[in-house]
Amino acid sequence: MTETDSQPIAENEQVKELLALLKDNNTPGYEEFSKLIEHVTGMEQRLLEATEELKAVRQEMQGLQNHSLKDALQKSYTAMEANISVMRHRLSELKSQIINGCRNILTDFRGRGAVALNGIKIGRAHV
C-alpha cells in the first residue's frame, strides 16, 4: 500500500496547494476541481466502510456452525473481497493521476505564473 492509497486525497499537499491556488486566482476550474476532490473523498469513505463491513462479515462467518451456509457465505465473501480489491486499485490509480496532474500544474505555475492556470480542464487528459 502506497502513501497515495492510505492518505485521503483531500489531505494531499499538492491537491491542497492547487485548490488554494485556483481559489486565490479565481480560476474557473476551481469549482469543478473542488467537486472532483469531494467526489473522490466520498469514494474513499465508501470503500473504507465496505472494507469494515467485510471484516465484520468475516468475523460473523467464523462463528457459524452450519457448514452449507458457511460455504455459501464464504463464496459471497470471496467475491465481495475481490470486488473491493479491484475498486481499491482503481481508486488508487485515479488518485495517482489527480496528484500527478496537480504536480504538473503546480510546476507549470511556478515556471510561467498565473498564465499557466488559463484553460485548465478537469478531466481524463488533465487533472
Task: Spell out what each predicted region is.
Residues 22-26, 102, 121:
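Generic secondary-structure transition motif, activating predominantly at the C-termini of alpha-helices
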Residues 1-4, 98, 122:
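Non-Sec secretion/translocation targeting segments of pathogen effectors
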Residues 1-92:
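Leu/Val/Ala/Ile-rich N-terminal alpha-helices, chiefly Sec-type signal peptides and the beginnings
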Residues 51, 58, 62-65, 72-73, ...:
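Coiled-coil heptad-register positions
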Residues 125-127:
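Conserved small/polar residues in nucleotide/adenosyl-binding loops
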